[in-house]
């Protein structure tokens, strides 16, 4: 899958039988910090990264999830290449699972402080965690009172990024990877379904905690997710702008994995499935099994692992990669255009500023950048 990841010509069959390329995460050993590594494509990426010999720090919501992850990854770590530069090949030397609950900025601040105290440089910071509550009629709230989709998918990630940026800039060929989605763009197939993404003047975020939507409108679960993915791109672009202005260099890669619907009960759609089990089952049957428009978690995980570790042609700057459907069973992973709103520099600066203010007002330590 990832031979020629950067060639713009990577076309993959989307049937369930094709084997993922074993070279997905090959390359010099890197320290990768990953969110959303306990399930879905994040877990698949974590497995491939460990198997390829990289060192992982995976944020976990609580001690129980950290223990479960260790149990899953222990046998995978034993399959790592023999010729590793690490003197200690134990799982404990290659996997750290600090507690950092993305729905609680206090937990994220505590986690970031521990990582900063430890002081280990981060080569690749992978902000991958995300949730969606399709079909929900009422908003859920984070510990600080922000709508939960926005809080987890964007706000906690910006807080983490701002705090850990010094460690990232100390890394080897440092890289930021942010998981977004094609639905951020109202002109794409997924973006056209339901209300489109749109932040307007960020009236809801200006209000602070308690706003159901970033634009100040009434709650809509699908739009909340689309808006959060738009925020991911604006955040990534604004960081790139700030660093360029300061003379700093960083590879900033945002990407869309495509539509990933696992066959089990876990993965990204686990929350939406609880809201509308019949509708989600029907959607999966049509999109995955009949039309074959979906990507498998294994291949999406391989793409994420490759973005985190393989060498891109351009060592610095922002790029957006998308895994787009060409037809039944065929997808192309290539550099793509982001939406018109995602290219709005003024909106990116305002979102960053208001998000940083919201984080600071929640008791977070002063942010870098």
What is the predicted role of each segment?
Residues 38, 65-68, 99, 263-298, ...:
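Extended hydrophobic/aromatic segments used for targeting, binding, or gating
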Residues 2-272, 362-366:
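Rossmann-fold NAD(P)H-dependent dehydrogenase/reductase core
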Residues 320, 365-369:
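Short, flexible loop/turn segments with low-complexity composition
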Residues 283-335, 345-346:
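C-terminal helical subdomain
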Residues 354-355, 359:
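C-terminal functional modules
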Residues 210-222, 281-288, 332-337:
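Short glycine/proline-rich turn/loop motifs
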Residues 272-275, 340, 351:
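A catalytic-pocket lid/entrance helix-loop region that shapes and gates access to the active site
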Residues 141, 246-256, 317-340:
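C-terminal/domain-terminus segments
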